[in-house]
């Protein structure tokens, strides 16, 4: 059980206290923790369970007299505190509870001796009480160890308490016993704040004692807390309560100074301040005690930078001791400043922002008109110069804000001295709260003075040059305000006490962010504060601009490359041929006028060249209007000569290889390919025809005539009366074919073979060659054979002729002509079918 652990140190407490606890087991006290003990931070007892409530009543009986005193103090505090302040606090509770829990862990290390504060949250929520009770038990154990040193004899009596008071009980009695020990000495705990003051600096963590003194002295600080809840209420209440407002205003003004410290200090201070405010209200005003936030001062110490921001050195040095005991008033002022940073600071900044924005636009327009150059190089130089100026201006801003805060603090040193005399812990608390109040009052007066003459407050120009969001400026103001509250102001005061200097110092810091152009324009538009503040920056800017303008004046547009002479001439001819021709003529004539001899030759040649030859033309051969003037002719001739020269030069110039893609070579088959042109027609030579000359045989006519005469035998024709003139040839053929069965057949066949072996000879050479082909011996044989065997053939041939001669003599003449015509086919048939020798024999025999 967590409650069992604190029992052992509690047993070591004085026996007199334990006896009193035994006597007072169930008195009327349980009603008190509901109403008053919540306010009586020292005497209130936590009731984590129902058993605890019974034990608390037993513990509180011996404390009746000190409780009455505490009740009186609580009534006085309630009178001082305004009732409306209390309700807004619970509204804040949702956000602050989380922060309070964070601070409780930090506070436990510093709060060994005062268990009364953790008792407060018991009335609000038992769930929270259970969580807090564990932390409280740890605190009580630490507290009891110190008590044991003071009263070792009391340890024996607490052993009996173990029997009566079981695990949860010892936490409750331990706290009132420690207070009873103080009360036995001289009721020091009962006005818990007054008597326990010396113990605090030793233990460095009991905000309860510190809370009462600043509350009695700084009663107006308490109502300032609700002001932070709503920005509207803050603005109205600040006007009514000047003491509280300046703390917020001063802190707001101080917050603008340090940008690096802004986010870190704001988060930490907001948590710490919210916790401290709740502590003060719970202990003093609220009937609804919150979780124990005994010493929020530990939380106010500069924690490790949450967002990489670093507190200034004076903040870090002063925050160590001050953080342990920051009073309620200081926390309230810080909360007001933090919450009001958005409202009050923005109220001051926004009108200036509107003015500055307008002025910047006007200045930019003027500068743009004056400055035609818009080169990227100028922009780069400007950004570099801006960065350098921004760093310097940030330093100046920090120094100026510090000096302003110091000057304000120097004006009201009385409050600081009184607080310092009260004690080390109170000095730290008073510096935070009272100094903030004094600053707020002084700044209200100063701001009223500033608003009338200077239209632009020093804060206004800071943002507009970069046109950064208002939230950033407000955060800067809050940071500077927090820094100023924690600073030891005395050594800084003599540096720059006057408000005018502070304003002038603040104003130049503002233009540092914008570009150099904008800064100068702002200075020109707002001459009064800015001009004296930054002569160096302006001189540097002006010198830089002059150098940039001289060096960086816009270069003339790049000249186009000269076209080649041919291209230029061609373009001139296209666009303005008349001007081009006249210019060429003028140039040619002007350059060559002194050479009179050359010109004469050229004119003569040009005139003569107009005609077919170079002779003098006759009159009327040409139109005199067409004759060119001598100068023009000279120019044209010279231009022609130029063209000829150029053409000759180009012709003689080596032909350049056409540039193709490099590194790619054609394959050898393609590169070395040879194209051969072959005609489609094949030429063939040969003898188309030949001529042979031979003697004509005149005997043929005689043969035909004789053959017709010899063949006049009508016998065969009588049998073949059917054949007409047309059928003579057919009859002859049939007869010749019908009679192959002659006994001389073998010889005839032999002859036929011979004849067939040489048929072409008969065709080509003609029928006249039969005499040559057939030997005389064969002819004689055939004559004999005809007489013997071939009588029928002769008869047939003779019959053809005889039938014709039966007609008249005229018909005989015609028949002779017909036979002449029929002679050739008869011989042809003989050659093809029958041995031609037979016919030849007949022919030879007949003459």
From Swiss-Prot:
<feature type="compositionally biased region" description="Basic and acidic residues">
    <location>
        <begin position="535"/>
        <end position="544"/>
    </location>
</feature>
<feature type="compositionally biased region" description="Acidic residues">
    <location>
        <begin position="809"/>
        <end position="818"/>
    </location>
</feature>
<feature type="compositionally biased region" description="Basic and acidic residues">
    <location>
        <begin position="267"/>
        <end position="289"/>
    </location>
</feature>
<feature type="compositionally biased region" description="Polar residues">
    <location>
        <begin position="189"/>
        <end position="227"/>
    </location>
</feature>
<feature type="compositionally biased region" description="Polar residues">
    <location>
        <begin position="570"/>
        <end position="594"/>
    </location>
</feature>
<comment type="similarity">
    <text>Belongs to the AIM21 family.</text>
</comment>
<feature type="compositionally biased region" description="Polar residues">
    <location>
        <begin position="174"/>
        <end position="183"/>
    </location>
</feature>
<protein>
    <recommendedName>
        <fullName>Altered inheritance of mitochondria protein 21</fullName>
    </recommendedName>
</protein>
<feature type="compositionally biased region" description="Polar residues">
    <location>
        <begin position="11"/>
        <end position="28"/>
    </location>
</feature>
<feature type="compositionally biased region" description="Basic residues">
    <location>
        <begin position="656"/>
        <end position="667"/>
    </location>
</feature>
<feature type="compositionally biased region" description="Polar residues">
    <location>
        <begin position="316"/>
        <end position="328"/>
    </location>
</feature>
<feature type="compositionally biased region" description="Basic and acidic residues">
    <location>
        <begin position="102"/>
        <end position="112"/>
    </location>
</feature>
<feature type="compositionally biased region" description="Basic and acidic residues">
    <location>
        <begin position="358"/>
        <end position="372"/>
    </location>
</feature>
<dbReference type="Pfam" id="PF11489">
    <property type="entry name" value="Aim21"/>
</dbReference>
<feature type="compositionally biased region" description="Basic and acidic residues">
    <location>
        <begin position="228"/>
        <end position="258"/>
    </location>
</feature>
<feature type="compositionally biased region" description="Low complexity">
    <location>
        <begin position="290"/>
        <end position="306"/>
    </location>
</feature>
<keyword id="KW-0963">Cytoplasm</keyword>
<feature type="compositionally biased region" description="Low complexity">
    <location>
        <begin position="31"/>
        <end position="57"/>
    </location>
</feature>
<feature type="compositionally biased region" description="Acidic residues">
    <location>
        <begin position="423"/>
        <end position="435"/>
    </location>
</feature>
<feature type="region of interest" description="Disordered">
    <location>
        <begin position="799"/>
        <end position="818"/>
    </location>
</feature>
<feature type="compositionally biased region" description="Basic and acidic residues">
    <location>
        <begin position="72"/>
        <end position="81"/>
    </location>
</feature>
<feature type="compositionally biased region" description="Acidic residues">
    <location>
        <begin position="376"/>
        <end position="392"/>
    </location>
</feature>
<keyword id="KW-0206">Cytoskeleton</keyword>
<dbReference type="InterPro" id="IPR021582">
    <property type="entry name" value="Aim21"/>
</dbReference>
<feature type="compositionally biased region" description="Low complexity">
    <location>
        <begin position="474"/>
        <end position="486"/>
    </location>
</feature>
<feature type="compositionally biased region" description="Basic and acidic residues">
    <location>
        <begin position="634"/>
        <end position="647"/>
    </location>
</feature>
<comment type="function">
    <text>Involved in mitochondrial migration along actin filaments.</text>
</comment>
<dbReference type="GO" id="GO:0030479">
    <property type="term" value="C:actin cortical patch"/>
</dbReference>
<feature type="region of interest" description="Disordered">
    <location>
        <begin position="1"/>
        <end position="675"/>
    </location>
</feature>
<feature type="region of interest" description="Disordered">
    <location>
        <begin position="704"/>
        <end position="740"/>
    </location>
</feature>
<feature type="compositionally biased region" description="Basic and acidic residues">
    <location>
        <begin position="123"/>
        <end position="149"/>
    </location>
</feature>
């Amino acid at each position: 059980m967590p409650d069992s652990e604190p029992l052992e140190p509690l047993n070591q407490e004085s026996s007199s206290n334990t006896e009193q606890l035994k006597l007072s087991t169930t008195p009327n006290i349980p009603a008190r923790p509901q109403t008053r003990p919540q306010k009586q931070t020292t005497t209130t007892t936590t009731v984590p369970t129902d058993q605890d409530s019974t034990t608390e009543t037993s513990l509180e009986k011996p404390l009746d007299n000190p409780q009455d005193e505490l009740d009186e103090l609580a009534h006085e505090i309630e009178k001082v505190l305004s009732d409306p302040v209390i309700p807004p606090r619970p509204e804040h509770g949702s956000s602050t509870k989380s922060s309070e829990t964070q601070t409780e862990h930090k506070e436990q290390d510093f709060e060994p001796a005062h268990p009364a504060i953790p008792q407060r949250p018991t009335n609000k929520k038992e769930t929270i009480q259970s969580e807090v009770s564990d932390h409280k038990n740890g605190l009580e154990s630490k507290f009891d160890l110190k008590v044991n040193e003071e009263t070792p004899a009391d340890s024996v009596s607490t052993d009996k308490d173990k029997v009566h008071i079981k695990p949860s009980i010892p936490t409750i009695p331990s706290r009132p016993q420690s207070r009873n020990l103080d009360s036995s000495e001289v009721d020091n705990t009962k006005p818990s704040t007054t008597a326990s003051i010396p113990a605090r600096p030793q233990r460095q963590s009991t905000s309860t004692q510190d809370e009462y003194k600043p509350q009695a002295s700084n009663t107006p600080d308490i109502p300032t807390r609700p002001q932070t809840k709503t920005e509207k209420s803050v603005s109205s209440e600040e006007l009514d309560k000047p003491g509280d407002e300046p703390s917020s205003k001063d802190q707001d003004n101080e917050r603008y100074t340090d940008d690096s410290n802004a986010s870190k200090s704001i988060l930490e201070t907001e948590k710490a301040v919210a916790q401290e405010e709740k502590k003060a209200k719970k202990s003093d005003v609220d009937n609804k005690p919150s979780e124990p936030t005994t010493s929020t001062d530990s939380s106010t110490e500069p924690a490790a930078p949450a967002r990489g921001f670093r507190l200034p050195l004076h903040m870090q040095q002063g925050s160590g001791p001050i953080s342990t005991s920051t009073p309620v008033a200081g926390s309230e002022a810080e909360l007001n400043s933090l919450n009001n940073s958005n409202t009050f600071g923005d109220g001051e900044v926004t009108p200036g922002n509107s003015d500055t924005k307008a002025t910047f636009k006007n200045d930019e327009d003027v500068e743009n008109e004056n400055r035609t150059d818009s080169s990227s190089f100028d922009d780069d130089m400007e950004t570099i110069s801006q960065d350098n100026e921004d760093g310097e201006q940030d330093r100046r801003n920090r120094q100026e804000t510090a000096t302003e805060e110091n000057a304000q603090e120097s004006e009201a040193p009385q409050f600081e001295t009184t607080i310092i005399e009260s004690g080390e812990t109170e000095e730290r608390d008073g510096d935070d709260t009272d100094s903030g109040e004094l600053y707020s009052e002084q700044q209200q007066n100063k701001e009223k003075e500033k608003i009338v003459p200077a239209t632009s407050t020093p804060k206004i120009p800071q943002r507009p040059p970069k046109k950064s969001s208002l939230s950033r400026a407000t955060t800067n103001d809050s940071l500077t305000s927090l820094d100023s509250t924690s600073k030891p102001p005395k050594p800084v005061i003599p540096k720059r006490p006057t408000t005018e200097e502070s304003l002038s110092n603040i104003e130049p810091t503002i233009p540092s962010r914008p570009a150099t152009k904008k800064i100068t324009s702002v200075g020109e538009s707002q001459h009064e504060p800015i001009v004296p503040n930054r002569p160096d920056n302006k001189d540097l800017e002006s010198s830089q601009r002059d150098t940039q303008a001289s060096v960086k004046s816009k270069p003339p547009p790049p000249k186009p490359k000269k076209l080649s002479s041919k291209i230029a001439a061609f373009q001139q001819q296209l666009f303005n041929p008349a001007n081009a021709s006249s210019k060429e003529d003028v140039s040619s004539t002007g350059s060559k006028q002194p050479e009179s001899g050359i010109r004469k030759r050229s004119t003569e040649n040009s005139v003569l060249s107009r005609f077919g030859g170079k002779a003098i033309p006759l009159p009327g051969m040409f139109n005199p209007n067409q004759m060119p003037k001598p100068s023009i002719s000279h120019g044209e001739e010279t231009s022609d000569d130029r063209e000829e020269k150029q053409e000759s030069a180009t012709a003689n110039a080596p032909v350049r290889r056409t540039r193709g893609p490099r590194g790619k070579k054609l394959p050898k088959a393609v590169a070395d390919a040879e194209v051969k042109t072959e005609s489609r027609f094949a030429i063939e030579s040969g003898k188309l025809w030949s001529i042979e000359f031979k003697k004509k045989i005149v005997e043929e006519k005689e043969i035909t005539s004789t053959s017709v005469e010899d063949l006049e035998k009508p016998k065969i024709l009588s049998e073949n009366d059917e054949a007409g003139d047309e059928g003579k040839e057919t009859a002859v053929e049939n007869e010749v074919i019908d009679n192959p069965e002659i006994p001389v057949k073998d010889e005839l066949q032999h002859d036929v073979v011979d004849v067939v072996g040489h048929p072409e000879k008969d065709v080509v050479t003609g029928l006249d060659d039969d005499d040559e082909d057939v030997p005389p011996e064969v002819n004689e044989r055939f004559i004999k054979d005809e007489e013997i065997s071939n009588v029928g053939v002769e008869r047939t041939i003779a019959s053809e002729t005889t039938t014709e001669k039966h007609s008249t003599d005229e018909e005989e003449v015609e028949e002779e002509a017909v036979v002449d015509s029929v002679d050739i086919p008869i011989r042809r048939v003989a050659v093809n079918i029958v041995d031609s020798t037979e016919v030849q024999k007949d022919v030879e025999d007949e003459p």
